[in-house]
């Protein structure tokens, strides 16, 4: 696959990260194969996870083709950039086409990135996963590699202002590969959830204590932070979805439409999907 824009974009991003004083704390990157197809499954805590997550494959000199929602590709600036990097557009109403494209990429030996939670976790713990990651890996016959991101939420996430002040640490932990067979997608997805959750815990444990004091808003409640509990996060997600659907219905001129109306009721402005 010919890449004209991806390498210079990476160089530009690295320069920007140096300006921001970002420190990368990485582990397990040897699990990303240097050749052949592989599916990287990331947790999702930030709007820029797909920007920073690609660095998990840099030590192996691989470029990650991320699956991202269609609306990102519709943007007049972001769309051409995403297409030039050969990322994969996902239509949440009809995911068959994007799944076929991901399978083709993987069978051609590419590395594909997916966010099986589908949307950002407000609790910063791993939410329930969609089964797409295990099904795609099984059908393509490639390893499924869990990757935990930590600290990205401090820069840009839901319900909090952006903070690009200098000197933050970004944790990236790559786990050992799984080899789904597709015989039991439910069990294989549960195993992916277990592994991804364990990697997130490792990333939290390894994170500099001075940057992560008790009571930090970016810490899960279970780790002494003030982030919403998983239960409360689900409630907030539902409230956001209902409010968004109602706004869309009103904009369409339907005052009687309920909170579940609107063709894009599941779209939350989040660039990455699973």
Predicted regions and their residues:
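Extreme N-terminal tail/first-helix region
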Residues: 1-16
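Non-catalytic C-terminal accessory region of glycerolipid acyltransferases
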Residues: 4-5, 96-274
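Catalytic core of membrane glycerolipid acyltransferases/transacylases, capturing the structured
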Residues: 10, 18, 33-94
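N-terminal signal-anchor transmembrane helix
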Residues: 15, 19-35
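Short, structurally constrained coil/turn elements
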Residues: 18-20, 60, 108, 166
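Glycine-rich, highly charged phosphate/nucleotide-binding loops
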Residues: 23-25, 93-99
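Generic structural signal for residues in well-ordered beta-strands
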Residues: 24-26, 87, 170-172
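Short acidic-hydrophobic, aromatic-tinged amphipathic segments that line or gate anion-handling sites
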Residues: 26-27, 88-91, 180
């Amino acid at each position: 696959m010919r890449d004209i824009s991806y390498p210079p974009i990476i160089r530009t991003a690295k320069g920007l990260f140096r300006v921001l004083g970002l420190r990368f704390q990485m582990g397990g990157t040897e699990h990303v194969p240097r050749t052949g197809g592989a599916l990287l499954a990331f947790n999702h805590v930030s709007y820029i996870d797909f920007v920073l997550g690609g660095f998990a494959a840099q030590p192996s000199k691989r470029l990650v083709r991320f699956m991202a929602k269609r609306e990102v590709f519709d943007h007049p600036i972001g769309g051409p950039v995403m297409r030039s990097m050969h990322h994969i557009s996902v239509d949440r109403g009809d995911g068959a086409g994007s799944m076929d494209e991901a399978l083709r990429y993987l069978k051609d030996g590419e590395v594909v990135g997916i966010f099986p939670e589908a949307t950002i976790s407000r609790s910063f713990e791993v939410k329930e996963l969609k089964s797409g990651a295990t099904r795609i890996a099984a059908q393509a016959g490639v390893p499924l590699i869990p990757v935990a991101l930590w600290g990205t939420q401090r820069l840009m996430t839901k319900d909090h202002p952006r903070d690009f002040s200098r000197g933050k640490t970004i944790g990236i932990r790559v786990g050992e590969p799984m080899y789904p067979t597709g015989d039991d997608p439910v069990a294989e997805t549960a195993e992916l959830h277990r592994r991804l959750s364990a990697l997130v815990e490792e990333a939290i444990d390894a994170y500099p204590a001075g940057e992560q004091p008790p009571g930090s808003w970016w810490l899960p409640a279970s780790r002494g932070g003030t982030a919403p509990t998983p239960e409360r996060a689900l409630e907030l997600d539902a409230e956001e979805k209902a409010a968004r659907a109602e706004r869309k219905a009103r904009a369409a001129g339907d005052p009687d439409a309920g909170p579940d109306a609107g063709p894009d009721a599941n779209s939350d402005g989040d660039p990455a999907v699973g």
